[in-house]
Curated annotation (Swiss-Prot):
UniProt source species: Methylobacillus flagellatus (strain ATCC 51484 / DSM 6875 / VKM B-1610 / KT)
Sequence positions that bind 3-methyl-2-oxobutanoate: 42-43, 81, 110
Protein name from the UniProt record: 3-methyl-2-oxobutanoate hydroxymethyltransferase
Its EC number(s): 2.1.2.11
GO cellular component: cytoplasm
Amino acid sequence: MNLLTLQQMKERGEKIAVLTSYDASFAALSDKAGVDVLLVGDSLGMTMQGHANTLAVSLRDMEYHTRCVANGTQHAFIVTDMPFGSFQKTPEQAFENAVLLMAAGAQMVKVEGGAIMLETVRFLVERGIPVCGHLGLTPQSVHQFGGYRVQARDEAAARQLLDDAKALAAAGAGMLVLEMVPAALAAAVSQAVHIPVIGIGAGKYCDGQVLVLQDMLGIYAGKSPRFVRNFMQGAGSIEQAICDYVAAVKAQTFPGIEHTFE
């Protein structure tokens, strides 16, 4: 799997199945089950380290887990989150840190933010580092948002998000994640940009879907997010649960209306 293949999948309407991964064993299972993209997410701060958010995750953490995932992967495309504080200062800072993640096995790095990140995205892409953007709910800004809330529900915010998506694509971003935005807006973004758009809590009309591995396996304390489906129920094994997730994404039976925000 590579960026060109993912682009071709969008063009022919084949949905892209993305799942987070943090270690070699689960990466190998996901790879075998047909997951197209493995996201080494800074969500590991919550799922693996027990923090309340992603802000404490370090660059060294992301390097380590990227290396683990790469060691267990043969086919899937590997995207690694750039953690909080590792890319916001200057494009040069972002490049130096992205190089470390690429050396650890990432094939693309993901950065959160809209128009403010355009110079950095351009800088990285011009120097050979593929970049995935992330709009909507950007977890590294959780305190600014006042919690994990649906974004871009009013007309002005929706217009800004659409403009940001177009600008990121024009700056050279090769993929885009949309998190917790209304389904109609996500559909409009997917149609407006030429790059694959991956949704999480963004409805079924994105070019692909991503979930946190632990969430889709039902491993969470308290109430699960609305956009999550527990694929472990009735699956019998973790591998089968992942296979069922991939199949549901490809068949567009996940996400359903019950997982979607309007």
